[in-house]
Curated annotation (Swiss-Prot), chains A, B, C:
GO terms for molecular function: ATP binding; hydroxyethylthiazole kinase activity; magnesium ion binding. Pfam families: HK (PF02110). ATP binds at R123, T169. Its EC number is 2.7.1.50. Keywords: ATP-binding, Kinase, Magnesium, Metal-binding, Nucleotide-binding, Thiamine biosynthesis, Transferase. HAMAP family: Thz_kinase. This is Hydroxyethylthiazole kinase. Catalyzes the phosphorylation of the hydroxyl group of 4-methyl-5-beta-hydroxyethylthiazole (THZ). Substrate binds at M47, G196. It comes from Roseiflexus sp. (strain RS-1). CDD domains: THZ_kinase.
Amino acid sequence: MDPINQRIGDMLARIRATRPLIHHITNLVVMNDTANVTLHVGGLPVMAHDAEEVAEMVAHAGALVLNVGTLSPDWIESMLIAGRRANELQTPVVLDPVGAGATQLRTRTNLELLRSLRIAVVRGNGGEIGALSGEGGEVKGVESVSGPEDPLTAARRLAQTYHTVVALTGARDIITDGERVLTVNNGHIWLTTLTGTGCMATTMVAAFAAVERDYLLAAAGGLAMFGLAAELAAEKAHGPASFKVALFDQIYNLTPEQVANGARVVEGGS
Amino acid sequence: MDPINQRIGDMLARIRATRPLIHHITNLVVMNDTANVTLHVGGLPVMAHDAEEVAEMVAHAGALVLNVGTLSPDWIESMLIAGRRANELQTPVVLDPVGAGATQLRTRTNLELLRSLRIAVVRGNGGEIGALSGEGGEVKGVESVSGPEDPLTAARRLAQTYHTVVALTGARDIITDGERVLTVNNGHIWLTTLTGTGCMATTMVAAFAAVERDYLLAAAGGLAMFGLAAELAAEKAHGPASFKVALFDQIYNLTPEQVANGARVVEGGS
Amino acid sequence: MDPINQRIGDMLARIRATRPLIHHITNLVVMNDTANVTLHVGGLPVMAHDAEEVAEMVAHAGALVLNVGTLSPDWIESMLIAGRRANELQTPVVLDPVGAGATQLRTRTNLELLRSLRIAVVRGNGGEIGALSGEGGEVKGVESVSGPEDPLTAARRLAQTYHTVVALTGARDIITDGERVLTVNNGHIWLTTLTGTGCMATTMVAAFAAVERDYLLAAAGGLAMFGLAAELAAEKAHGPASFKVALFDQIYNLTPEQVANGARVVEGGS
């Protein structure tokens, strides 16, 4: 077995064994879904956003998710407080820049988070990563209408600028720390028919980052498992909602062995 | 084929072809569901409520949904900002007056929105439309306990007062611009067993209004398709939750031809 | 038939006959789920949190749920306003102390609610009840990592201190008013794989409390029915999400007779 696959399977086993708390400060649309995804992959979810408690809460967490999908000023403040505390504790922070590029508020806020915090992984679609990297792309609401012309270059530039790992998800997922590149070929077109699948992918990345300090590999692991679950779920789908039920069931049912066998991760961005 | 049916099928085809952005400022209970309904019918959803970004966001939208289901003052302010910008751009605004009649805050806020903005369509249940029209009816929480004695008169009066289209949904849906009247006979009793089906219907209306300037017909189209999906979903339901899965699958799977064939829309309010 | 079972079946029949409004001031994660559970058991849900309307809304309610899962200061203020009005009207208030013990804000807020209001039932997991009673236990995020050494003593102490009924849910549910004790043996391990099942249980308790002034028995009834629905749903589950669909369907489909027959409630805490 490819050593990457073996390591991805091992990460899932560690999530299931240690049940890391994944603290989310996330948007109002996906809270229920991402809490369930956290539980199904093996972690413990908590959604807490008040400035008074986020620093205390994140101190118990294995990873922190910052997701700006339904932004408001007081939540941004809480994200900064929680993020700084996570940085002090070396707890990985995973950023989902939902809708970056769609409005100035979203673009500016994401750049502020990237500048103010040490972000372990940024997980976004082509339009969002394009907007943040300055390499172009278009976002309509929260959907990527078009990505940057060269996604890998955009991801690499963003990763280098902010010393982070960038995971640009789409038909194929590109992950880079600015030098190394991994490509994840798992996934299914049904994922585009549901709201919040990007946010769910981010939660998967956070769960893996909670148990693996090589964040490039952690991101690949989370995305490969999510994509694999989607592939298997598609066999039972009659539409987006039955696909979602099957997807969540699969995330719960997949074993470390199945994930190690089914992950399709390759080195390089070709 | 009835020309109305043909036009309804054509509208769905246009939604699928143009994927209009449907900007929602909506309640916390239904955000996920209405985002998914938007995607399944063929549009792109975005939920954005911060005063700083709503005017910018709505400028890219094909329609704006204002839904007061879980009201708070800062969201009302955002609704007014987004609504005014939508009015400037001639983008249709669809209002869902959730719980109008249940509390003074809800009744007053909905009337303020109706007075301050040019609303394309108001979609509410009998109790809500009754309360806003002054024709009576009772709302308990967000449910219509009893509608106005004469629903058509209530709908007509509200439509005339605010120069809008009123869609009063129930066992049969009545839609009027104050003069013309359409009745939609699609639907299923299972819809009453789920939370948020009124809000979902509003989202359907908004998606159709994004591609059709005859808002009376657009409202009929959205409601007919929603009701038709419910009829087909009921065949697979073992209870409300399996009904919901089937309903969402159906909204996604229905083709323009099926909707044109299955819509049961008649002129007049008899 | 055991008289307790008969009374539980009768309560469900009363819920279905009178459709009490269950006013929730609850967390952002579970709003949709608990609204649906309210409808499926037979009540009418409303989620309303603005300080300006909560007193008016709760005046029409059969029960008030206060759930602190995603806390912020303005919501706490609304909880106090609604709770005081409910107390004046003798409307039962059911508290779900989500995450008590996890942060100081959560522990302090729950104790403040317990001191300021007359709470009919507190429904929490072992860690939460342990933290509030001072009897120990550990909460990680919102999950009970470990309960108090002697759950019954913790529940009893909390009940006595605040003159309330405490329902400590887990593999077996312990319910006490400080003197009398009931144990509910219904339930299923699948409930631990889904987010918000504690909150759903609280909603069930509130629906039963809306029609039964013996809150000890009402809590047992709500929890027994919820657990029974879970047992039946487990037969159709392929994972947590299909379990959830089946659970919600079952809550809707269960008849008073089935609940009277299937409830496994015993007196005492052994």
